[in-house]
Structure formats: C-alpha cells, structure tokens
C-alpha cells in the first residue's frame, strides 16, 4: 500500500475535501488532481523520493499539495511563518529539488531558495476551482507513483533540546500509521473532520488528513485554528470529530462558555487530543460540554505520529493516560537497552511498521 493507493478508498462521487465558501472536491477529482500534479512534477524532471518543499498557508491547496507530492515524490512541508534565516537552514538541510509556494506569495522562502539555487514554482488556483485544485506547470510527463519503500514525507524534530534532526518517513510508514489511527478511532467513510492543525506538522498531516483519506472520509480544511469561528464552522460543516492540541481544546471550551447555544447539539462522535499532555480538568470539561468520548493519544514524528491511544468505547478513556499501543510495539528500557517493568522509569522505545527507518 502507498499514498496513491490510499486515495482509492473513496467512492468517485464522495466528498474528499471541503473549505468554507468553496465548492467541494470529490475523490474522483482528487485522484485526477494528484495524478496531474505527479505528471507535472515528472515533467520538471522529478521522480520518486525526490524532495519537494511545500510552503503554503493552511487550507485545501496545502492538503492536496501534500497528498500529490507524497504520492509521487517526497513532501517536505515547512512552516509558512518562518523567517528567511530559518528557511535557509531547513532548505540547506533538506536539499529539496523544488519549492512550491502560493501564487502571488512574497514569502521569504523565495529569497532563501534563490540563494541555494533551488527553483520555486507557484500553485495557481483557477477561477471557480474546487477546494484543493491548483496547477504548477503546463508541461506534463509520464509519472509512476512512489513505491512502498520510497520516501514519502520528511520533517524535522522540534529541536527543543538539540539541533533539529531530519526524520524521513517512507510510504509504508505513512500507510501503517493511517491504518492504526483509523482503527483506533473506528473511522468510516461517513466521518467528516474539521482540520484545525497546521499542515506542516505530523499531527495534521497524518492523524487528520491521511487517516481520513484512508477510509474515504472527508476533511474540511480551514485556514487555520480560530477559536472564535470554531463552533460555527463545526456546526455548518456537520463534523463528526476533530483533533487538536490541549491549548486548542482550552480555547474552544472558553468559547463554548460564551456561546452555549452554539456548543449544544454538535453531535460529535469523538474529540481527539495529541502532541501534548491533556490536563485532566480539560478532559473532564470536554466530556461534559460536548457529550462524546475524548481520546487522548501519544505520538511522535519518528513514529509517523501515533504510538498509543485511549480506547474509543464509552467510559474506556482515562484522564491523564495516553492509552495502549495501537499496533507498534512499545516498551520502557534503561540506558543499557534492557527492558524494564511497566512501572519503572526509563526511555520509551518503539518498534513497528510505522517507525522511520532513519
């Protein structure tokens, strides 16, 4: 299985991507778009595992750009808010062969790429295009989707304790993680997620986007998290779930207190939390306000996101608990790489199909 075959899960006329005030993109249109972008990139001389940096704002075009590049080459999404010096570091470290930017953007990545002689191409959205549609080049060439062992996504660790490290993830890593998360959340093609996570981060890319696509489900791609708009967006889109970090959940709860009517009757099937520890008080309040399971999960970039998760069933979630392993093997080891008992203190070690080959 690869990212390109993952996209075959959705029925032709099923909705894949939506965005506020935009026509929806169906799975048939998404597959055509992904294949067209693959041919356009091939026409510029790129092939499987070649890295393509993507610097675009959150939204449907960023989502489809990731899926298209990862299906045929290797996607290297970067934070569109970086400074030129930061782009210079990441571009030099990643050595992409191309940078994709939003049409008309004056992002400083242009100058950083120019200094490194890396070509930049604009993603041009046509009038009345559905959410996620854009074009890069006029010329196209035959293109072969990436294989299971080709690099699909490359990100950096946060670098909070040392120099950020490159984390390459291959196609089978992404597929395994999407499958594991979809299973733990019991996703189906009737689910609709509101994405509020940045799409240059493993959480949004895998837990929301790739996982939904693997089940033929749909994703509403907002321009980014806005607590003032969240409840209205959730109601208008009739979403069944969302995934966020604790600070987002806290901001949503603050709005829910001020907009009690808007918070009622959303009918959420679940709320997922990851990327930081969810305070027990926030866990309880989310349960109380939205009347649905709150699923806290534990993940890291090197594991293509999720390693453990709370079970979905009623009453099976525990506050302050990251859950049980969701397919990868997880254990605690000491500095000599000897396994320890579960109540011992040591390093968390993982092994599985979703773990980066390094």
Regions found by a protein language model. Name each.
Residues 39-82, 94, 217, 271, 278-295, 302-358:
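Conserved AMP-binding/adenylate-forming
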Residues 26-28, 152-179:
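Conserved AMP-binding A3 loop
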Residues 4-26:
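AMP-dependent adenylate-forming
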Residues 57, 101-108, 223-226, 239-285, ...:
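Adenylate-forming
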Residues 12-13, 127, 138-156, 162-163, ...:
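Conserved pre-ATP/AMP-binding loop-to-beta segment of ANL
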Residues 104-149, 255-258:
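ANL superfamily adenylate-forming
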Residues 175-192, 202-240, 255-258:
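Conserved AMP-binding/adenylation subdomain of ANL enzymes
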């Amino acid at each position: 299985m690869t990212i390109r075959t993952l996209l075959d899960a959705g029925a032709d006329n099923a909705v894949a991507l939506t965005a506020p005030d935009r026509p929806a993109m169906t799975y048939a249109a998404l597959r055509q778009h992904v294949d067209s972008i693959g041919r356009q990139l091939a026409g510029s001389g790129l092939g499987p595992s070649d890295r393509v940096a993507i610097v675009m704002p959150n939204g449907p075009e960023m989502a489809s750009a990731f899926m298209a590049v990862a299906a045929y080459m290797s996607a290297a999404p970067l934070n569109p808010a970086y400074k030129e010096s930061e782009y210079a570091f990441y571009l030099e470290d990643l050595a992409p062969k191309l940078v994709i930017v939003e049409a008309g953007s004056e992002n400083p990545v242009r100058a950083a790429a120019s200094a490194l002689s890396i070509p930049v191409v604009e993603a041009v959205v046509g009038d009345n295009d559905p959410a996620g549609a854009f074009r890069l080049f006029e010329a196209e060439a035959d293109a072969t989707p990436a294989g299971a062992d080709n690099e699909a996504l490359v990100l950096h660790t946060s670098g909070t304790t040392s120099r950020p490290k490159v984390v390459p993830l291959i196609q089978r890593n992404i597929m395994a993680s999407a499958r594991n998360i979809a299973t733990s959340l019991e996703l189906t093609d009737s689910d609709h997620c509101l994405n509020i996570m940045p799409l240059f981060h493993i959480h949004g890319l895998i837990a929301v986007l790739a996982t939904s696509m693997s089940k033929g489900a749909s994703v509403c791609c907002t321009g980014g998290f806005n607590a003032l708009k969240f409840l209205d967006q959730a109601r208008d889109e009739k979403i069944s779930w969302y995934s966020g970090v604790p600070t987002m959940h806290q901001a949503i709860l603050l709005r829910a207190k001020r907009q009690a009517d808007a918070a009622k009757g959303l009918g959420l099937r679940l709320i997922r939390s990851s990327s930081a520890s969810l305070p027990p008080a926030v866990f309880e309040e989310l349960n109380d306000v939205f009347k649905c399971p709150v699923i806290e999960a534990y993940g890291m970039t090197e594991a293509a996101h999720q390693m453990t998760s709370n079970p979905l069933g009623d009453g099976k979630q525990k506050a302050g608990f990251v859950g049980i392993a969701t397919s990868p093997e997880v254990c605690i080891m000491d500095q000599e790489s000897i396994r320890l008992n579960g109540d011992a203190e040591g390093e968390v070690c993982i092994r599985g199909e979703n773990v980066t080959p390094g």
